[in-house]
Design a protein with these regions (language model features):
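Condensing-enzyme catalytic core mediating Claisen C-C bond formation in acyl metabolism
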Residues: 59-63, 86-91, 270-347, 356, ...
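Active-site-adjacent elements of ketosynthase-type condensing enzymes
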Residues: 42-46, 97-107, 164-171, 249-276, ...
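Conserved beta-ketoacyl condensing-enzyme motif
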Residues: 62, 83-218, 247-256, 351-367
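Phosphate/pyrophosphate-binding loops at sites that engage ATP/ADP/AMP, CoA/4′-phosphopantetheine
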Residues: 139-151, 303-310, 340-356, 378-382
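Glycine-/small-residue-rich "gating" segment that lines the acyl/pantetheine channel
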Residues: 177-187, 228, 232, 236, ...
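Short, well-ordered amphipathic alpha-helical segments that serve as non-catalytic structural scaffolds
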Residues: 132-143, 199, 298-300, 332-348, ...
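Active-site-proximal alpha-helical scaffold in enzymes
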Residues: 132-145, 196-248, 287-308, 397-419, ...
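ACP-dependent fatty acid/polyketide chain-elongation machinery
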Residues: 2-121, 143, 301-311, 408-422, ...
Length: 470
């Protein structure tokens, strides 16, 4: 094995990362170097690589983007607002926020689901399902797909969410207490509509998608993992088209009370637009937000066959677990770094290929420093040369929807060579000393972009997208 290991050390960076990708499939995460792998695992990975040599996985491209967010009710409006550095955070209006220490949120404005969803059906849905379906319409129209002409058995849906329709259950309980009657008995389907898998179901029902139907429930990592999972379905050939993304609709009192008790949310109520301050020395917690992001993903062959506009290619993704604490990040940042390395291995590229990072960056004192450390661990001295920005500085933390909206920002970045800023970054923090694109958007060529999502429960996910090249 000594001679073999010496040969492996002379592999090109891309070939070495291909081997690391095989090792990721074997062990669940990629090691940082081939030298750290046992002889047995190395031989297994090599056999797998040789066996798969004639079976190239299908390429996955992004052809449609949809969004409903605190800064825009379409993906186009959302992107324009992000580039302009517009905050969507204001005092909460959906319930009486007065008793709570954190009184602002990233609410979707002027949202009327009945513009696209029959009014009776919309009334039954949880807010997360309403947001998801409207974002899916936006994505479908943006893609130019002729839905009715598709083989619906080869169209699937994967959505991520943290808590699904908690707002529906919150309202059912509150109204039952007020009225003294069991509201569930009179409206049985309303309770079912609060289940976490309902956003995916409603998208499937709306478009008649009869392929794989899945829901990822991994808190703040859910949207990113949903896009990665959907990409895998296309890669292995089980479908041609996937709707994929994430959603959350949790501007509700129980959610505010919970995070207030954890002391996790910002209490800078005097100026809500400046409350979300990722990487800033005066950051004091995240701001709760709501919204949805949905992608239309296609196999490259399917997209080219119908003459689709292609925004970007999904190059790879990775995931890991901290196995440390239910809410706090691992101080060593090993899990976050492992997710990034796994995504690089899956994409078969070296760290030097990444030219932009959309950070998880929620604005918590521990979390932002933790992510900065992880980025330095993966990229070394070059970390200081990579532009990094936080979408959450403008929309707040969308939980299950965050990863999808932030991945959308990455896609638009590689498509337009424009990087949106991190707003409210005014006071440098010595622990957060990288290039966070403060306050003003930037033009720069970006061939590959990386998006991080780190969820409660220590769930880490990273997605990499790149410019499409035939």
């Amino acid at each position: 094995m000594t001679e073999l290991r010496q040969l492996l050390q002379r592999l090109s960076p891309n070939l070495r990362y291909a081997l690391l990708g095989e090792l990721q499939g074997l062990n669940g995460q990629a090691p940082s170097e081939v030298a750290k792998v046992s002889d047995a695992d190395l031989l297994t990975a090599l056999r797998s690589a040789i066996g798969d040599a004639g079976r190239q996985r299908r390429r996955v491209v992004v052809t449609g983007l949809g969004a409903v967010t605190p800064v825009g009710n379409t993906a186009v409006d959302t992107w324009d607002a992000l580039v302009a550095g517009k905050s969507g955070i204001a005092r909460v209006t959906q319930f009486d926020i007065t008793p709570y220490a954190s009184q602002m949120g990233g609410e979707v404005k002027n949202f009327d689901p009945s513009n696209r969803i029959p009014r009776k059906e919309a009334r039954r849905m949880a807010r997360c399902s309403q947001l998801a379906v409207i974002a899916a319409y936006d994505a479908a129209e943006d893609s130019g797909l002729d839905i009715e002409s598709l083989d619906k058995t080869r169209v699937g849906v994967v959505m991520g969410t943290g808590l699904g329709g908690m707002d529906l259950y919150n309202n059912i309980i509150a109204e039952s207490v007020r009225s003294g009657e069991n509201r569930v008995k009179s409206r049985p389907l309303e309770a079912i509509n609060g289940l976490p898998n309902m956003p995916a179901f409603h998208i499937s029902q709306t478009f008649g998608a009869r392929g794989p139907l899945n829901t990822i429930v991994t808190a703040c990592a859910a949207g990113t993992q949903a896009i990665g999972t959907a990409s895998e379905e296309i890669r292995r050939g089980s479908v041609d088209v996937m709707f994929a993304g994430g959603v959350e609709g949790l501007i509700v009192d129980v959610f505010y009370a919970s995070f207030e008790a954890m002391r996790a949310v910002s209490t800078s109520n005097d100026d809500p637009a400046k409350a979300s301050r990722p990487f800033d020395a005066k950051r004091d917690g995240f701001v709760i937000g709501e919204g949805a992001g949905v992608f239309v993903l296609e196999s490259l062959e399917h997209a080219i066959g119908r003459g689709a506009r292609i925004y970007a290619e999904v190059l790879g993704w990775g995931q890991s677990a901290d196995a440390y604490h239910i809410a706090a990040p691992d101080p060593q940042a090993t899990g976050a770094a492992a997710a990034m390395r796994a995504a690089l291995a899956d994409a078969n590229i070296s760290p030097d290929a990444i030219e932009y990072i959309n950070a998880h960056a929620a604005g918590t004192p521990l979390g932002d420093a933790h992510e900065t450390k992880a980025i330095k661990d993966v990229f070394g001295p070059r970390a200081y040369q990579i532009p990094i920005s936080s979408t959450k500085s403008m929309v707040g933390h969308l939980f299950g929807g965050a990863g999808a909206v932030e991945a959308m920002a990455c896609v638009r970045t590689v498509y337009t060579d424009t990087i949106h800023p991190t707003i409210n970054l005014e006071y440098p923090d010595p622990e957060c000393d990288l290039d966070y694109v403060p306050n003003v958007a930037r033009k720069a060529e970006v061939n590959a972009a990386l998006s991080n999502s780190f969820g409660l429960g220590g769930q880490n996910a990273t997605l990499i997208v790149g410019k499409f090249r035939e």
